[in-house]
Structures are given as C-alpha cells and as structure tokens.
Amino acid sequence: MLKEFKEFALKGNMIDLAIGVIIGGAFGGLVNSIVNDILMPIIGFITGGIDFSNMFIQLAGEKQATLSAAKTAGATISYGNFITLLINFLIIAWVLFLFVKGMNKIRRKQEKEESSKKMSLEEQLLSEIRDLLAKKK
C-alpha cells in the first residue's frame, strides 16, 4: 500500500497540483496586498476619503465608531469587507482568465503545428507507393 501511495504522490499531476497550490497561496497574498495597500486607498481618495474597512451596519447595541468595536457590541453586517473581497475576486478572476487564454493560444498553436506535420492518408499511401517504385528500379 505504501508503494502505491508513493507512485500516486510522485506522479507528475500530483506534483503539478502541489506547485499550483503553493503558487496560488502566494498569489492570493500578493492580490490582497495590491487591493488593501494600493487600490482601496486610491478608491477611498477618489470617493472622498471613504474607508471601506470600517463600512458596516450595526444591527444591535449602541452605535460604534469602528468595525471591531461594533462586532464586540453585537451583530454587524460588514459590507465594506465584502466590497474589498469582491475586488480581490475580480482581480484574481481576471488574471486567471488571461492566463487560461494565453495557455489556450499556445495549445492551439501547438496542435496546429502537429496537425500540419501529420500526413493525410492519401499522402501516406502516395509516399509508400513512391518508396515501393523506387525500390523496384
């Protein structure tokens, strides 16, 4: 059983998946930093200094100034956090779309090259006939 697991774990697809997960985790951190440290301050500046991290609706208790205080006081709806996560998602989805589009373009180009290299059935038969005729002479 250990041998079977080793064969499974060391297959190319499993290793590729592990590498993808690691790169995805690092990419997620990078996107979070871009959104939180670059885009959200710019959006806040454009919208007149709105801080999305403290946008919330307090459902219970006294009105609080910050999200953390409001969560301590009672139930809250943190729609500012949702806006930030939505922007994160859109950036990741866009980058993945561009990556997949590029990979598909490369794959189509390779398939086209491979199909042009393969001879059709008629071409193969004509080549065989030519070779046979050349041997008879």
From Swiss-Prot:
* Keyword terms of this UniProt record: Cell inner membrane, Cell membrane, Ion channel, Ion transport, Membrane, Transmembrane, Transmembrane helix, Transport
The record, for InterPro entries, names: Mechanosensitive_channel_CS (IPR019823), MS_channel (IPR001185), MSC/AndL (IPR037673), MscL_channel (IPR036019)
User: Which compartments does it reside in?
Assistant: Cell inner membrane
Q: Does the keyword Membrane apply?
A: yes
In terms of PROSITE patterns, this protein maps to: MSCL
Task: List the molecular function annotations (GO) for this entry.
Answer: mechanosensitive monoatomic ion channel activity
Quaternary structure, from the entry? Homopentamer.
Question: In which family does this protein belong, per the annotation?
Answer: Belongs to the MscL family.
- Under which name does UniProt file this protein? Large-conductance mechanosensitive channel
Q: Which organism is it from?
A: Bartonella quintana (strain Toulouse)
